[in-house]
Each structure stands twice: as structure tokens, then as C-alpha cells.
């Protein structure tokens, strides 16, 4: 990996991780657990939630030890796989490298929470009427955006041979 690609990874990751951790800290110090502040009435709240599971509450019903092991292991594995893929594509596929850096940063952002709290701070709460999309955070958003970029490259055969 050349220096420019490494700088791109570090810069994008640092910005996303810092924004993720800063927003989570702000929510945790401003709102008590489960408190909501309406931002757009009938559509969007800031709600302090501690998510013991994964996306959509995956594994939330398992013991804290099982969850912690599973998510720490999987998050670490994903981060390493993304770094491996980034190293192989960053010089030739610039847009893909931004997407991979976003996935990496999101995984690390949530991994920090799992190390610190054994669960993840979520707070972005979108809803329509009684239907609530599961709350999420900046790290989750980065992972989602990065995955959209990655899937685009896969679908349109823009991922290089590895």
C-alpha cells in the first residue's frame, strides 16, 4: 500500500471514529438511558439506547459473555478482512477505498463501545407513526454507506481480482 492510500485510510477512519465517539459521548452525557429528544416531530428523535446485540438487536437475548465474545471476535475479523481488501484495492480503486475505510472505521467505532461497555451506544431514532426503525449510530451509518459502495463495485464488476 502506498503512502497516499495509507494516509487516506487513516484520515477517513480517524474522522469517522472521532465523530462516532464524540456523538456517543454527547448523547451519554446529555440524555439519561431511554430518554428521547424530538428533533423532527413524528419522524426523528435522539434517543439514548444501549444495544447489547448487533444490528436489529441480533444476539440481544444471549448471555453478556457470549455476546461480548461473538461481537469482539466478528468485529475484529471484519476489520482485518477490510484492511486486507483495502491494501489490495486502494491504489487502483479510489472510491472503493473510501467505502472500505468507512466500513473499517464503523467496525472500530462499535468495537470501542463493546470493549468499554459490552454493548453499543445507539441514538439515531427514525420512525413513522408506531413503526420505529431500529436505533443506530454514526458507526452504523459509516458501515452502511461503505457497504453500499462495496456492493456497487461487486454488482458492476468493478472489484479487482484478489
Swiss-Prot record:
Entry's EC annotation: 3.4.23.36
Organism listed in the record:
Desulforapulum autotrophicum (strain ATCC 43914 / DSM 3382 / VKM B-1955 / HRM2) (Desulfobacterium autotrophicum)
Membrane topology per the entry is: Multi-pass membrane protein
* Pathway assignment: Protein modification; lipoprotein biosynthesis (signal peptide cleavage)
Under the heading PROSITE patterns, the entry gives: SPASE_II
Lineage start: Bacteria, Pseudomonadati, Thermodesulfobacteriota, Desulfobacteria, Desulfobacterales
Q: Which reaction does it catalyse?
A: Release of signal peptides from bacterial membrane prolipoproteins. Hydrolyzes -Xaa-Yaa-Zaa-|-(S,diacylglyceryl)Cys-, in which Xaa is hydrophobic (preferably Leu), and Yaa (Ala or Ser) and Zaa (Gly or Ala) have small, neutral side chains
**Name of the protein described by the UniProt record:** Lipoprotein signal peptidase
Please explain the role this protein plays, according to its UniProt record.
This protein specifically catalyzes the removal of signal peptides from prolipoproteins.
Amino acid at each position: 500500500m502506498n503512502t497516499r492510500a495509507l494516509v487516506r485510510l487513516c484520515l477517513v477512519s480517524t474522522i469517522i471514529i472521532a465523530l462516532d465517539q464524540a456523538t456517543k459521548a454527547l448523547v451519554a452525557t446529555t440524555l439519561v438511558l431511554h430518554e428521547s429528544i424530538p428533533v423532527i416531530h413524528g419522524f426523528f428523535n435522539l434517543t439514548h439506547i444501549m444495544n447489547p446485540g448487533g444490528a436489529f438487536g441480533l444476539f440481544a437475548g444471549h448471555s453478556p459473555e457470549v455476546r461480548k465474545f461473538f461481537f469482539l471476535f466478528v468485529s475484529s475479523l471484519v476489520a482485518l478482512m477490510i484492511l486486507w481488501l483495502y491494501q489490495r484495492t486502494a491504489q487502483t480503486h479510489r472510491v472503493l477505498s473510501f467505502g472500505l475505510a468507512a466500513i473499517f472505521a464503523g467496525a472500530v467505532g462499535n468495537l470501542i463501545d463493546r470493549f468499554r461497555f459490552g454493548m453499543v451506544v445507539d441514538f439515531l431514532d427514525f420512525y413513522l407513526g408506531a413503526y420505529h426503525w431500529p436505533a443506530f449510530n454514526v458507526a452504523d451509518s459509516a458501515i452502511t454507506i461503505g457497504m453500499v459502495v462495496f456492493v456497487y463495485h461487486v454488482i458492476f464488476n468493478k472489484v479487482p481480482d484478489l
